[in-house]
Amino acid sequence: SSDLMDEDTCMVDMARYFLNFTRDESCGKCNYCRIGTKRMLEILERITNGEGQDGDIELLEELAMKIKDGSMCGLGQTAPNPVLTTLKYFRNEYEDHIYKKKCTAGSCKALISYTITDDCKGCTLCAKHCPVDAISGKVKEKHVIDQSLCIKCGKCMDTCNFGAIEKK
């Protein structure tokens, strides 16, 4: 059997995923479900994109309770549950996303970066495999990743034979 969640699972992104699904399934008849889930999803997308703001957690909690109480059907009444549950048990992940601009699981691309350590031998393998030419450096010298060009695909890390690329 395989685990559905582990330390590489971002709970904020998981809540966003489930809320996106329930929003898509909403019939749209009641405002709480139709508009409320849309607003919650916008906040979660902002947080996972590294644009979370002070007050987002409280706003998510407030919207979640109003949606639960005001929705007319089971879907709307349960739609906020993944957000409420992850806030209850993994609140620190939300706080890390918002205040530290960090995804502990390393899965929210906007909140991660790849860096080349001093273990780099200058073999150029990472640069050759980078699809956007974000890595530069001379043969046998430490290479550098241009963060403004990096698309965070991880190919550099996968191809480095020296373990010289870190995901932060």
Label every PLM stretch briefly.
Residues 1-4, 165-167:
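Generic detector of short, aliphatic-rich beta-strand segments that form the cores of beta-sheets
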